Amino acid sequence: MAGPRTTVEAQAFYRMYHSYADIPDPWDRMRWCRYSLGLLQKDVAAMVGMEEWLYQDLESGAFHRSFTPELADKLAALYGIPVEDILDDYTLFLHRGGGAFLRRYREAKGWNRQQLADHAKVGCTSIRTWENGQKSISHKCFDLLVENLGHDFTAMLHM
């Protein structure tokens, strides 16, 4: 679907969510913003300089590594919303620097790499390569970090 085929489709979406604040998912927030501006997916994609298929995937909840921080910032600016509103936790983590964020988290906790590795239940070598940007953190590893580090990890992510 490139856009609401009818105003009925957009109205049905608006009935599902009474206000923007009610929308829990980033992809539905993007759809809400697009509908409120009366734009098609292809229009939004062209306006921010991304491929139409990528924007369609984003509105379907399929985030990709090709959804760069720069594209996220452009999309948020177009919609006039904070970039955090359109990113899931993993994409927000990447937007905040991935390994660089992990280093900031570790330093805020007062831990060395081995202590972080112990808490996260991953190898110290993984921590080092992630922090140094030698290796990117997969979605699976991010989920492991969230599970093992707990609420304060995601809370810091949203600060």
Show where each model-derived region lies.
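A short, Lys/Arg-rich alpha-helix, primarily the initiator
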Residues: 3-36, 88-108
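Short, structured motif recognition centered on aromatic/hydrophobic residues
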Residues: 30, 55, 83, 102, ...
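Key DNA-contacting residues within the recognition helix of helix-turn-helix
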Residues: 31, 56-57, 87, 128-129, ...
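Residues within the alpha-helical elements of helix-turn-helix
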Residues: 36, 47, 78, 108, ...
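Short coil turns linking two alpha-helices in DNA-binding domains
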Residues: 40, 51-54, 68, 82, ...
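Short alpha-helical "recognition helix" segments of helix-turn-helix
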Residues: 41-46, 113-118
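Recognition helix of helix-turn-helix/homeodomain-like DNA-binding domains
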Residues: 49-66, 91, 122-136
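DNA major-groove recognition helix of helix-turn-helix/homeodomain DNA-binding modules
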Residues: 69-85, 138-156
